[in-house]
């Protein structure tokens, strides 16, 4: 029978390495005590968002407000003493300190009035900050403080008043801050600290990219966030493939941005050179009827000149035909994708100007294909090849894009499990009978969790496999499959009907049939089976994005008897009319799990000026019988293992198996 001593002997190599950080019994014991204390703190608040679709202003607002958590803290601290309109102003100040602060200061008619406002605001912010910091150790709070004013903020947050007057003490410090012209900076720092401490973990359940204007701003903010994970959406993986240098993914990304007149973001923010594409497009398509290629526009982002729309439309057509050629090539290379029916350039009858889709032929809305050779429709002409070479070079050399995609790989995955919640963007592919769908890739069968794991691994191959290798090519092709493939867990539909929507007037060809998963996820038994597949008890939750919930038609985001929650963020403006809302977010605190329903967001400028918020409803999904502590979480499991290792280290010191550093602290 193995003893504890046997286990310590087996772990001696690891414990010796651990002793570098804790070179004495005193150091190890001190860490054990602080870690065991941490286990008894309340679980940190988790914030779940999904389907951001590049809508940076709405994202920033929901991030800053933590889906209403910040306002709840303001009301909790000040609700009995401060009028509602002042609390709304204070909440907006916390959301947007740099924008709101000048407005509030401008209302002060005199220096004395400004000093009074500074005093009241600083004291209120300190009280709110004390509340949100109560879930954290003092050491953690200190680590979040800015170096320039950290000592003073630490004093304000952690001072004790058993034997001296609180008002006098605070009054002296706050008065000195104002007198020395540092009030603005302290207000901004307190606002940022409140937002930092209010949410412990941010989960982004896919689709940072799409048609929205500034996905780059979203990624810049996420890269600065203190604790975030990402579950890839199908819009994300196609950008990941583009950054890896996949020609088909590059064309797909460009097709989407041009379709929504958002290519300026690629040029200005990522430094992508579209000059060669524009020149080729004008050469071959400049005189065409471009009516079906005109971009979707948003009046709020205009105005648009006729020349701007023409340039966008002509590039849209050029890149689309290039994309359809490359799709034929990818389908040829990957018969296991089972997409042979979607090589549409080969299914055109060039004499009749029709295309065969399934068993029927349909007339083409645009019959001009000057770069397509009917004898070899998938072949690129020299001009197209040059454009593609330049685009691949531009995407690969974009430093900012590479930084963003490396971050998506480092923080992202196909699915994520944390604290009993299973997070994924799209679907776990299923059959019509409600069983996990099975697919063969590279000679092996995959379904359920194994399919998700395979997708994750092959997606990483597309970026990290050696340049020029077959593995890298295979991985990049698969990133495109994850974007639009029938059994892609990130897509969850029968087909991406891009060609049909462009070229065929008959809307019956535009249908994208949802995976049976989206029927079966209403069944509680199926949701429990999915949870079990990922090693979770049936009482836990699935957090899903991807599919907008049509609330105005009576659809509920809560599926499967409460086991699954759809939180498509509804950030995409195009969906608001269909859904009746601007989507959902989820908040999981130490006491409750709550679904937050949002109304459409107009603009940050209006939110700052009018103290507007966009949360309209809070729906409690689950209330805990007892407050969840850190020891009840996944982090708690890691910390308990750490305590176990540290106790073994102490024993190893006591046995003389590891030499202890000299310690002057005789308490131990």
PLM segments and residue spans:
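Feature recognizes metal-dependent phosphohydrolase scaffolds
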Residues: 1-668
